[in-house]
UniProtKB/Swiss-Prot annotation:
Domain Peptidase S1 intervals: 20-239
Designated name of the protein: Trypsin-1
Signal peptide feature range: 1-13
Residues annotated as site: Required for specificity: 189
InterPro entries: Peptidase_S1_PA, Peptidase_S1_PA_chymotrypsin, Peptidase_S1A, Serine_Proteases_S1, Trypsin_dom, TRYPSIN_HIS, TRYPSIN_SER
Lineage, broadest ranks: Eukaryota, Metazoa, Chordata, Craniata, Vertebrata
PROSITE patterns: TRYPSIN_DOM (PS50240), TRYPSIN_HIS (PS00134), TRYPSIN_SER (PS00135)
Originating species: Gadus morhua (Atlantic cod)
Record's GO cellular component terms: extracellular space
Disulfide-bonded cysteines: 26-155, 44-60, 128-228, 135-201, 166-180, 191-215
Length: 241
């Protein structure tokens, strides 16, 4: 199982053509917190949480990267984009590459983002979302479709699953810093290239796209870093760094 997860994560880092599965094109700039992490190509997503900081997944770590904000069509300059380099990239101190626990990192920008209708921050949680809450995951990851235009930001509505359903899907692998969201019957999921991107529930960042067994497979929903559990570290780091 570990090797399968490792392959998925490698795909998340290196696959340029990877998109959301079973979703739809987001309304343009409706996910204005969504960013693309770029090192000459899109390799992961992220979320703007203040004018100076982006949240992403720790497994997306690169010591230097460029953050692209205000994107919709990732291969077309639409005049709404902002490109800002990282000044610091900080993984959670207890991140484990073995079991992908505490899969969260912060990126400090070299200059503040200009907040406008195309670029704005998403709120951090003050409490965890309840089971069955409907959320939106977005990204430029693998659509596994010949129809969907994955160069345009894709969205997917999906419910938070119970801890029991999540643990049953991945026995012995789910920690308190993870949750599952999606459909046990399969067919809809985040996928490679979506890693690090947002799961937003009622306007609040509750999840970071982390890992899973394949994409959109039956009884194997997507697994996400649980931001409500990790938000203390996020807030402390932003305040003190």
């Amino acid at each position: 199982m570990k090797s399968l997860i490792f392959v998925l994560l490698l795909g998340a880092v290196f696959a340029e053509e990877d998109k959301i599965v079973g979703g739809y094109e987001c309304t343009k700039h409706s996910q204005a917190h969504q960013v693309s992490l770029n090192s000459g190509y899109h390799f992961c997503g992220g979320s703007l949480v203040s004018k100076d900081w982006v949240v992403s997944a720790a497994h997306c770590y690169k010591s230097v990267l460029r953050v692209r904000l205000g994107e919709h069509h990732i291969r077309v300059n639409e005049g709404t984009e902002q490109y800002i380099s990282s000044s610091s990239v900080i993984r959670h101190p207890n991140y484990s590459s073995y079991n992908i626990n505490n899969d969260i990192m912060l990126i400090k920008l070299t200059k503040p983002a200009t907040l406008n209708q195309y670029v704005h921050a998403v709120a951090l949680p003050t409490e965890c979302a309840a089971d069955a809450t409907m959320c939106t995951v977005s990204g430029w990851g693998n659509t596994m479709s010949s129809v969907a235009d994955g160069d345009k930001l894709q969205c997917l509505s999906l419910p938070i699953l119970s801890h029991a359903d999540c643990a049953n899907s991945y026995p012995g692998m789910i920690t308190q810093s993870m949750f599952c969201a999606g459909y046990l019957e399969g067919g809809k999921d985040s996928c490679q290239g979506d890693s690090g991107g947002p799961v937003v529930c009622n306007g609040v960042l509750q999840g970071v796209v982390s890992w899973g067994y394949g994409c959109a497979e039956r009884d194997h929903p997507g697994v996400y870093a649980k931001v409500c559990v990790l938000s203390g570290w996020v807030r402390d780091t932003m305040a003190n760094y």
